[in-house]
Amino acid sequence: MNEVTMMAEDRAAGELRFTRVFEAPRELVFRCMIDPDHLTHFWGPQGTSAPRERITVDARPGGVFETVMVNDADGNEYATRAVYDEVREPELLAWTESHSGMKVVTRFVALGPDRTEVQIHQRFVPKAFLTPETQAGFSSSLDRFAAHLARVAAATSPDHAEKTGKRELR
């Protein structure tokens, strides 16, 4: 299942749930979600970028997660600041966004050595983020994440090492 699933009944309660399966090991999927060198490649919907120098991650309870997404078309910036409530590598990330109070819990479930289900549950979602357009944007960021994971997984595979003589571990 590589589709994003959302529960309409949760939307009415100010909650969103997204589930997506990625063709990559759980440890890699988790690492990409806490490493600014990876986040810069996929954080935000299509049409935005997240400059590496504007991403801060201190993945520990009480640590800060900060990003700035830049709209590629007009240069508008969208900042996010959150504080980690819980971090259990490679199983779970939970944070609360400072500006909205939205709580996000992301679970990483191994479905085998090279498949991971990511379950994202957002609570206290601001009404502005409950629109179909915003949800489509979030889904497109998961598409970008899948593409990034595919590139990284390919670069770290034994086949890649055999062809290039090196194995890139990130």
Annotate each predicted stretch with a short phrase.
Residues R26-E27, A59-R60, D85-P90, R107-E117:
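A short, structured loop/turn motif at beta-sheet edges
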Residues A13-T19, R26, R52, V64, ...:
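Intrinsic-disorder/low-complexity, polar/charged segments enriched in Ser/Thr/Lys/Arg/Asp/Glu/Gln
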Residues V29, L39, F65-T67, Y84, ...:
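Hydrophobic pocket/interface hotspot
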Residues L92-S140:
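Beta-strand/loop substructures that line and gate deep hydrophobic ligand-binding cavities in soluble
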Residues M1-S49, R170:
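Hydrophobic ligand-binding cavity/cleft-lining segments
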Residues R17-F18, D37-E77, P158-E162, K166-R170:
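Short beta-edge strand/loop motif at the mouth of beta-sheet-based domains
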Residues R20, R54-V57, T80-E86, K103-A110:
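Hydrophobic/aromatic beta-strand elements that line small-molecule binding cavities or substrate pockets
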Residues R123-R170:
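A conserved amphipathic terminal alpha-helix motif
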